[in-house]
């Protein structure tokens, strides 16, 4: 959520920043509601003071011997009752204005940092660096979905029978390979200082509102009809909300969390795109990284977050590039974001496998997540960061293509081998599909 004081003090600056994102926002209405609410608050406080004064006056008169049922005391009590009724009306109207204002504020995306490149869409993102050789192979490379089915790593038709389209079932060596990837990712991140969490896979509406998925992206999520619970679209939601409505001692910052979870997305706007394979599914596996930091640390922690995600791609020997997202391509909650895009030889292009975002205090304001400096009064909002470390299905898909050998076998990268059962690993380091 944006700082309301910033909107009051520098509305044009906020308007220009939102325009860079291509966001449509009724700032004038928000400021109008805020102004009316503050006027009512001023009036209510004055009436409350008057009511308190009347109460004291009545008490004083009675102590001085006035008749409690007399005309003077009765008139003052009636005046006090009228004031209380007016105060109650003002409080009700204040709540209505506050509710409408908060509803509008929740629809506003985060403001991009001044350093973010200005652009309209992904075509204007800026490449930062590359790693590995993204070369067109000298031998034919099957798309990952074809080689996976050929090797018996996944079941598509039977998964669709159990659920619907955009679901798959990993089986045999495919399941073992996915499990090995998850274990490798978690072990690397734990070694880098992250605390592993197994969070709830169902969260309430307040949690989704805290990280910015609600109200804007309700149509993208799966909801349990009889409960205020949603299947998580990413572990970012439960991890970031672990400390919601709490005050963290500043000396405990930064906090690092990692989690493996299944993730669930309706993909309502992706009809006809990536209909085969592991790229775009309703249910997919992901290892997520979340940081809760002091504001002075967040930019440095953002760069470390990107490096932590990059480390997995390097361990898997997968060519990739780092891209900074332009203003028009930023996620709703992000103030700055770097995407990691892994190379897919069959498509002759890079595809996103991780988004590493610095949300500044945007999510913290929505979740009321604060810190307190020792020996100082007051609290301040933390900064939150998140990134995929990595999307497991896409990592597996990229591995099947980039390490596909001329004979059709799949070479398992050295760093992954200790996590894969020897039943599925041949002596020359290739994936064995029939142990």
Curated annotation (Swiss-Prot):
Gene Ontology MF: a single term:
ATP binding
Note whether Signal occurs among the keywords.
no
Alphabetic keyword roster: Aminoacyl-tRNA synthetase, ATP-binding, Cytoplasm, Ligase, Nucleotide-binding, Protein biosynthesis
Q: Which terms in the GO cellular component ontology are assigned?
A: cytoplasm
What are the BP-aspect GO terms?
selenocysteine biosynthetic process; seryl-tRNA aminoacylation
Which CDD domains has this protein been placed in? SerRS_core
Enzymatic reactions: tRNA(Ser) + L-serine + ATP = L-seryl-tRNA(Ser) + AMP + diphosphate + H(+); tRNA(Sec) + L-serine + ATP = L-seryl-tRNA(Sec) + AMP + diphosphate + H(+)
The domain section of the record reads: Consists of two distinct domains, a catalytic core and a N-terminal extension that is involved in tRNA binding.
Family (UniProt): Belongs to the class-II aminoacyl-tRNA synthetase family. Type-1 seryl-tRNA synthetase subfamily.
Question: Per its database record, what is this protein's job?
Answer: Catalyzes the attachment of serine to tRNA(Ser). Is also able to aminoacylate tRNA(Sec) with serine, to form the misacylated tRNA L-seryl-tRNA(Sec), which will be further converted into selenocysteinyl-tRNA(Sec).
Identification of the protein by name: Serine--tRNA ligase
| Gene field | serS
